[in-house]
Amino acid sequence: MDDADKSCSPSLDHSDINDPMIVAVESLDTSKKRKLHAEESDLLPLPKHFCSEHQASLVNSSCPSSVIDYAECSYAMENTKTSDEASSSASFTGPSLYMFKDSIYSTGSSSSGYAATSSIEQCFSKVDHKTQEDTQDFTHMEFIYHDSEFAVEDLQEVLNPVESYILSSARWSVSNQDSKEATTKPTIDQEFEQYFSTLMM
């Protein structure tokens, strides 16, 4: 260290160790990588009460509630992840939590592990409940379709009028309009197909 650095930072000797001002100044050394609590709060996810207030404001918006529930669940999983990381940051032998939708496995014992798994199970049950409600909503589409003006028979009549017939080869339809089209010369493919169809008979 050069002389300027020595003059800026106070030195600790055994007589000054009980002085709280010197200890406080030493703990605020800016060259260290340790982050202050205010800096860490920007990196942490939003508190849960903020998410619930935000959800209440989104009730009248166009965002479906299943998306909001999914966002809450992902927040709960992130919160669980950060709390597990904080508890095992001292060593890598701390409890780790592996979560799946149908089953939850925990290696090691942790009091927060049960709370985390129960909150995640609740989130998955909310999302499953919403998807079941959505599928029930689509079952009514069958009745709406039958009441519409375009039924299956109507669509078939539009696509294939009563006077037109489809050949067995299903390449083109034959109708009364073919007499008008007979004046036009058939394409080479049509001539080829007609020639071989007569040979096969």
UniProtKB/Swiss-Prot annotation:
GO terms for molecular function: protein homodimerization activity. The keyword Membrane does not apply. GO terms for cellular component: cytoplasm; nuclear speck; nucleus. A motif (Nuclear localization sequence (NLS)) lies at residues 32-35. Induction: Activated by FHY3/FAR1 under far-red light (FR); HY5 prevents this activation. Down-regulated by FR, red (R) and blue (B) lights. It comes from the Eukaryota. GO terms for biological process: maintenance of protein location in nucleus; positive regulation of DNA-templated transcription; regulatory ncRNA-mediated heterochromatin formation; response to blue light; response to far red light. Disruption phenotype: Partially blind to far-red (FR). Impaired inhibition of hypocotyl elongation and cotyledons expansion under continuous FR light conditions. In plants lacking FHY1 and FHL, altered phototropism (e.g. phototropic bending) associated with abnormal consitutive cytosolic localization of PHYA. In the double mutant fhl fhy1 several PHYA-dependent phototropic responses are altered (e.g. A motif (Nuclear export sequence (NES)) lies at residues 43-46. It is found in: Nucleus; Cytoplasm. Inactivated by rapid reversible PHYA-mediated phosphorylation. Keywords: Cytoplasm, Nucleus, Phosphoprotein, Transcription, Transcription regulation. Its main location: nucleus. Belongs to the FHY1 protein family. Can activate transcription. Essential for light-regulated PHYA nuclear accumulation and subsequent PHYA phototropic signaling processes. PHYA-specific signal transducer in response to continuous FR lights. Mediates the association of PHYA with HFR1 and LAF1 in the nucleus in response to FR conditions. Contributes to inhibition of hypocotyl elongation in continuous blue light (B). Homodimer and heterodimer with FHY1. Interacts with PHYA, especially upon far-red (FR) light illumination. Binds to LAF1 and HFR1. This is Protein FAR-RED-ELONGATED HYPOCOTYL 1-LIKE.
